[in-house]
Amino acid sequence: MEKQYLTVTALTRYIKTKIEYDPHLQSVWLKGEISNFKYHSRGHMYFTLKDENARIAAVMFAGHNRNIKFRPEDGMKVLVKGKISVYEASGSYQIYVHDMQPDGVGNLHLAYEQLKVRLEEEGLFSRVYKQPIPAYAKTIGVITSPTGAAIRDIITTIKRRYPIGNVIVFPVLVQGEFAAPSIVQAIQTANEMNDIDVLIVGRGGGSIEELWAFNEEIVARAIFASKIPIISAVGHETDFTIADFVADLRAPTPTAAAELAVPNILEMQEKVLQRTLRLQRAMREIVHKRQERLQTLQKSYAFRYPRQIYEQKEEQLDRALEQLVLAKERYMEKKVNQLKQLSFYLEKHHPAQRISQTKIAIETLQKQLRREMQTVLQTKEFAFVRIAKQLEALSPLKVMMRGYGLVYSEKNQVLKSVKDVSAGDVVSVQLQDGILDCNVSSVKERESNGK
């Protein structure tokens, strides 16, 4: 019988098909320790999950890991859910993780601190974004479990302190896998309503695992995005969750949250009573002072003798009118005098007179300018004639007219000595009326005795 050989690829695909069609391997929960953790630039996570005796490669793609509530690290113990498959290129089986959460309280605390630091850096805890709690809320929304002590304590406290307040309960899961989405949905539903003044979000006490829904990032961001002020009331006084840091106000217990959400109607009634009494006292004092003022006015001279007051005011009016007429006449007289002074000044400084004076001054300056120019021209003319005569006396042409000439070498240089010329050289002699080109037949130097 002829043997049939499989290719490595065919065998690997066969094994992969067997694994992927095994229903027990399509939804596997594993727990182990992370090692060789790598975070790819595209958002994928690659790591090894191991225990004391074995290890398995693990991949968590970006679409699944963006919702996990902590940052995985080497050495962290985790619980993962995923499916088993084969990576054909290396022929190794690995788990494709769909969900991951810390394993144990220590790792929950680590995830809590990681999220707390990240949200604080983003500013979700800043007081800048805290909304004020209304002093007199008409409608109070309560997001908690519909059963248990928390809802009972909140409603009892609100009805005792503020019976006129309206309470709307949004029942949610407060622990477990689906608690966080349930709380987020309730916050969003409450914000879609227009008649809720304040929200209380919380539950009774419990372990860190039981309170973990209030440490979820989606709950923190829903609280931060709420347009309705939120009071957090999670656990006991010593319990602090991420929701407490993001909320607009943190209450140590659900009962305390109810007390912070509404005023005490008995205290309000006492304040109203005190202010009513103060208002009544103030009104009595005002009425008393007005009555005393009225009595004083009734006893005054104006009320007792109004006719005399009227006649006095008429006399004062007549005097004021006389003073007004006199003041008007004085004012007119003053303005007439000012007008006369201005007329005299304008006549004295009339433009025609100033133009005439300026014209005479210009004519005088023109005559003076002509005289000065003539004098300067004559002076310059005399100087020019003198300098021209000096130049004429010094001119080489003047000397040439007396029979002298200038001798030039072939290089057109003036010859000053017979030593600069040799027999046979050609020289040029410039005379008054032209130039002679001459050949030197001999050179004779003057003797020391002048011969």
From Swiss-Prot:
<dbReference type="InterPro" id="IPR003753">
    <property type="entry name" value="Exonuc_VII_L"/>
</dbReference>
<dbReference type="GO" id="GO:0008855">
    <property type="term" value="F:exodeoxyribonuclease VII activity"/>
</dbReference>
<keyword id="KW-0378">Hydrolase</keyword>
<comment type="similarity">
    <text>Belongs to the XseA family.</text>
</comment>
<dbReference type="GO" id="GO:0003676">
    <property type="term" value="F:nucleic acid binding"/>
</dbReference>
<protein>
    <recommendedName>
        <fullName>Exodeoxyribonuclease 7 large subunit</fullName>
        <ecNumber>3.1.11.6</ecNumber>
    </recommendedName>
</protein>
<dbReference type="InterPro" id="IPR025824">
    <property type="entry name" value="OB-fold_nuc-bd_dom"/>
</dbReference>
<keyword id="KW-0963">Cytoplasm</keyword>
<comment type="subunit">
    <text>Heterooligomer composed of large and small subunits.</text>
</comment>
<dbReference type="GO" id="GO:0009318">
    <property type="term" value="C:exodeoxyribonuclease VII complex"/>
</dbReference>
<dbReference type="GO" id="GO:0005737">
    <property type="term" value="C:cytoplasm"/>
</dbReference>
<keyword id="KW-0269">Exonuclease</keyword>
<dbReference type="Pfam" id="PF13742">
    <property type="entry name" value="tRNA_anti_2"/>
</dbReference>
<dbReference type="Pfam" id="PF02601">
    <property type="entry name" value="Exonuc_VII_L"/>
</dbReference>
<comment type="function">
    <text>Bidirectionally degrades single-stranded DNA into large acid-insoluble oligonucleotides, which are then degraded further into small acid-soluble oligonucleotides.</text>
</comment>
<dbReference type="GO" id="GO:0006308">
    <property type="term" value="P:DNA catabolic process"/>
</dbReference>
<keyword id="KW-0540">Nuclease</keyword>
<dbReference type="InterPro" id="IPR020579">
    <property type="entry name" value="Exonuc_VII_lsu_C"/>
</dbReference>
